[in-house]
């Protein structure tokens, strides 16, 4: 019936309007934030260690980040490598810093993997320490290959196909509405792997980052 179709379109219009308002509010909120890190800083630091054994590179990077940003990098006893299954790929991450608007983490795969990048309300950049990163952007017919020392940037709302070779490791920086990225990162837990222990590890790592930021904000860097 015409009235039913009109009502359905009214609901669709309302939902799209709400989504548009939420997106605008999110970006206005981001515009008021004082960020701790920058994409350029993380990329420059990671490039210094590109080509090294990834474990050595990561340990040196962590020391340098703590020196430059005291009170914003998790202590060694709270660092944990956690599996990530999302978009058809599998990797592992270690969160160094996390807030509502930023994160810094170590990421990679020992075996190689490929899948969908996801779409985010955030900009994500990866600077490669070892291995290869293949990216096929939406709307194109050719892929690109990135090597150690190079940075791959994934803009807000973008989607790509990606593939990592065996023993590919990188440093990742994200800026945007960070809680929104968890929906993609955790979806496979509910609909595929049902690995709820990894879900717990992931949420605990993010909660630790939020707690550290709150503690530093309230009591200063030496708390």
From Swiss-Prot:
GO terms for cellular component: anchoring junction; cytoplasmic vesicle; endoplasmic reticulum membrane; glutamatergic synapse; growth cone; lipid droplet; membrane; nuclear inner membrane. This is Sigma non-opioid intracellular receptor 1. PANTHER family: SIGMA 1-TYPE OPIOID RECEPTOR-RELATED, SIGMA NON-OPIOID INTRACELLULAR RECEPTOR 1. Residues 2-8 are annotated as: Targeting to endoplasmic reticulum-associated lipid droplets. Homotrimer. Interacts with KCNA4. Interacts with KCNA2; cocaine consumption leads to increased interaction. Forms a ternary complex with ANK2 and ITPR3. The complex is disrupted by agonists. Interacts with RNF112 in an oxidative stress-regulated manner. InterPro entries: ERG2_sigma1_rcpt-like. Depletion by RNAi enhances kappa-type opioid receptor-mediated analgesia and prevents the memory-improving effects of (-)- and (+)-pentazocine. Sigma receptors are classified into two subtypes (Sigma-1 and Sigma-2) based on their different pharmacological profile. Belongs to the ERG2 family. Disruption phenotype: Mice display decreased hypermotility response induced by (+)SKF-10047 challenge and reduced formalin-induced pain. Mice display motor coordination defects, muscle weakness, partial neuromuscular junction innervation, and motor neuron degeneration. The C-terminal helices form a flat, hydrophobic surface that is probably tightly associated with the cytosolic surface of the endoplasmic reticulum membrane. Residues 177-223 are annotated as: C-terminal hydrophobic region. GO terms for biological process: lipid transport; nervous system development; protein homotrimerization; regulation of neuron apoptotic process; regulation of postsynapse assembly. The record marks 126, 172 as: Important for ligand binding. Functions in lipid transport from the endoplasmic reticulum and is involved in a wide array of cellular functions probably through regulation of the biogenesis of lipid microdomains at the plasma membrane. Involved in the regulation of different receptors it plays a role in BDNF signaling and EGF signaling. Also regulates ion channels like the potassium channel and could modulate neurotransmitter release. Plays a role in calcium signaling through modulation together with ANK2 of the ITP3R-dependent calcium efflux at the endoplasmic reticulum. One of its GO terms (molecular function) is mu-type opioid receptor binding. Residues 1-9 are lumenal. The chain crosses the membrane at residues 10-30. It is found in: Nucleus inner membrane; Nucleus outer membrane; Nucleus envelope; Cytoplasmic vesicle. Residues 31-223 are cytoplasmic. Widely expressed with higher expression in liver, brain, kidney and thymus. Expressed throughout the brain with higher expression within cerebral cortex, hippocampus and cerebellum. Within the hippocampus expressed in cornu ammonis pyramidal neurons, the granular cells of the dentate gyrus as well as interneurons. Within the cerebellum, expressed in Purkinje cell bodies. Highly expressed in the brainstem and motor neurons of the spinal cord. Expressed by neural retina, retinal pigment epithelial cells and lens. Keywords: Cell junction, Cell membrane, Cell projection, Cytoplasmic vesicle, Endoplasmic reticulum, Lipid droplet, Lipid transport, Membrane, Nucleus, Postsynaptic cell membrane, Receptor, Synapse, Transmembrane, Transmembrane helix, Transport. Residues 99-106 are annotated as: Important for ligand-binding. It is a single-pass membrane protein.
